[in-house]
Swiss-Prot record:
This is Ribosome-binding factor A. Belongs to the RbfA family. Keywords: Cytoplasm, Ribosome biogenesis. One of several proteins that assist in the late maturation steps of the functional core of the 30S ribosomal subunit. Associates with free 30S ribosomal subunits (but not with 30S subunits that are part of 70S ribosomes or polysomes). Required for efficient processing of 16S rRNA. May interact with the 5'-terminal helix region of 16S rRNA.
Length: 116
């Protein structure tokens, strides 16, 4: 049963963090589309590792957006504490998730093989 609770907490944090990034943060450096792909909260609720995909063709823009997200982690943590009632408000650690880009690359390779 604790695994089920952990999954619910992860999904709730994922939904709220996505909402905060899309609607609450007013940082002009956030120019690309950002998607929260996964959230892993530790069992003691001290840390939340947030995996994000940043959709941009420019590598420099991705870095700027990721830096802006990292600098907004305190603000996101504060808003999460107001919205979600848990014992400890977790420290947010952002991780860049390139699995979507990798999947698109693999799909392109498969298409090239099919075309030959």
């Amino acid at each position: 049963m604790p695994n089920y609770r952990g999954g619910r907490i992860n999904e709730e944090f994922k939904r709220e963090i996505s909402n905060i990034i899309q609607n609450e943060i007013k940082d002009p450096r956030l120019t690309a589309m950002i998607s929260v792909t996964d959230v892993k909260v530790t069992k003691d609720l001290r840390y939340a590792k947030v995996y994000v995909s940043i959709f941009s063709t420019k590598e420099e823009e991705k870095k700027d957006n990721f830096t802006a997200l990292k600098s907004a982690s305190g603000f996101i943590r504060k808003i999460l504490g107001q919205r979600i009632n848990v014992r400890h408000n977790p420290e947010i650690l952002f991780e860049l998730d390139d699995s979507i880009n990798y999947a698109m690359h693999i799909d392109e390779l498969i298409q090239k093989v099919k075309d030959k």
